[in-house]
Amino acid sequence: MAKKSMIVRNARQPKYAVRHHNRCKLCGRPHAYIRKFGICRICFRELAYKGELPGVKKASW
């Protein structure tokens, strides 16, 4: 889990745009961030399996 202080700090708008860090909106994870959805890969996987992400379906070939 992300540190509570980092989640709160990231929620505020930074003074300079370069200081912005991509963090998951649900859990605050800084790595494996998917820009299109604004969440990390773990949260993405959970939501996709539940069917809560529109337009996402499991691949099969």
UniProtKB/Swiss-Prot annotation:
Binds 16S rRNA, required for the assembly of 30S particles and may also be responsible for determining the conformation of the 16S rRNA at the A site. GO terms for biological process: translation. This is Small ribosomal subunit protein uS14. Keywords: Metal-binding, Ribonucleoprotein, Ribosomal protein, RNA-binding, rRNA-binding, Zinc. Its cofactor is Zn(2+). GO terms for cellular component: cytoplasm; small ribosomal subunit. Belongs to the universal ribosomal protein uS14 family. Zinc-binding uS14 subfamily. InterPro entries: Ribosomal_uS14 (IPR001209), Ribosomal_uS14_bact (IPR023053), Ribosomal_uS14_CS (IPR018271), Ribosomal_uS14_sf (IPR043140). The lineage of its organism: Bacteria, Bacillati, Bacillota, Clostridia, Eubacteriales.
